[in-house]
């Protein structure tokens, strides 16, 4: 049964003060609440991802809070494009993050208000990788504003090409452009597609067929997550069970946790 396969939540956002964007989860987005739901969902591992200015996030203390909650939760730092983005300063920032216990950084173009053609984006990704940090790039590109159109799949394809052999996790995998992002990522074997948000938000739409296809034909390149508190890891468990029904068990394990654990290298605990 696929419900015996533990999950690795690729994108969780528990916050120090339990709050979130707007009033959606005011006071209810705590580490304790997330841990309880993760245990109920048989979710053994999670990337806990901070966002600048949200829920009391502080880079200096977030990693310690994550590690104190569970040895199987791994902190990811928010990368702010403000301030000095010179090579030496980036190296210093990433070294500090690594020394603080972070396993990666999250680049969120909408929140950071940057475009994928930002002149320091490629160096930032490369230097983070050199420091041993995984890079998570948000690919939910839809927002208001005169510059919003500049973040699109053409820009994403160009970015991957400029990076050459990028090691990236593409958060949300392009949402409604899922299959197109799959083909954009296909030539880059170290690019992992994260189905958080997309898996739950578009339930009942034509994307269900695309997700089913990817579980069966692209199972070595995808992972699942909640984007909590937008969606619960319990919702992810239910959706995972739907798509894993009748699936080769090895493919189900790939999607559930193996791909993401391989992507992160040796930082995660054994499957057990």
Language-model-derived ranges and their functions:
Residues 12, 32-55, 73-80, 102-104, ...:
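Divalent metal-dependent hydrolysis catalytic cores, especially in the metallo-beta-lactamase
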Residues 1-10, 14, 23-45, 219-221, ...:
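Mid-to-C-terminal alpha-helical segments outside catalytic/metal-binding sites
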Residues 15-18, 53-56, 82-85, 112, ...:
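Active-site environment of divalent metal-dependent phosphoester hydrolases
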Residues 104, 118-223:
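Catalytic pocket-lining loop regions of alpha/beta-barrel enzymes
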Residues 7-17, 110, 136-138, 170-173:
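Histidine-centered catalytic micro-motifs
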Residues 11, 38, 97, 105, ...:
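Conserved, mostly hydrophobic/aromatic
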Residues 7-10, 47-50, 76-78, 106, ...:
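Active-site neighborhood of phospho(di)ester-bond hydrolases with catalytic His/Asp-centered motifs
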Residues 26-37, 84-97, 178:
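Short, acidic/polar
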């Amino acid at each position: 049964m696929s419900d015996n396969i533990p999950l690795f939540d690729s994108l969780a956002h528990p916050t120090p003060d339990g709050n979130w964007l707007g009033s959606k989860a005011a006071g209810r987005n705590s580490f304790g609440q997330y841990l309880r739901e993760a245990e109920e969902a048989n979710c053994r591992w999670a990337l806990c991802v901070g966002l600048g200015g949200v829920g009391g996030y502080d880079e200096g203390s977030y990693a310690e809070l994550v590690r104190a909650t569970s040895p199987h939760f791994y902190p990811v730092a928010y990368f702010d494009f403000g301030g000095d983005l010179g090579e030496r300063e980036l190296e210093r920032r990433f070294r500090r993050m690594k020394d603080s216990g972070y396993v990666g950084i999250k680049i969120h173009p909408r929140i950071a208000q940057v475009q994928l053609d930002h002149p320091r984006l490629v160096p930032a990704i490369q230097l983070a990788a050199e420091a041993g940090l995984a890079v998570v790039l948000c690919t939910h590109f839809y927002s208001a504003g005169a510059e919003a159109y500049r973040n699109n799949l053409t820009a994403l394809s160009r970015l991957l090409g400029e990076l050459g052999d990028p090691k990236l996790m593409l958060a949300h995998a392009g949402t409604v452009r899922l299959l197109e992002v799959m083909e954009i990522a296909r030539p880059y074997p170290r690019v992992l597609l994260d189905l958080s948000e997309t898996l739950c938000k578009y339930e009942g739409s034509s994307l269900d067929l695309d997700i089913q296809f990817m579980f069966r034909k692209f199972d070595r390149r995808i992972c699942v997550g909640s984007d909590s508190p937008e969606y619960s890891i319990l919702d992810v468990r239910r959706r995972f069970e739907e798509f894993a029904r009748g699936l080769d068990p090895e493919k189900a394990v790939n999607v559930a946790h193996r791909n993401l654990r391989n992507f992160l290298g040796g930082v995660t605990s054994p499957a057990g």
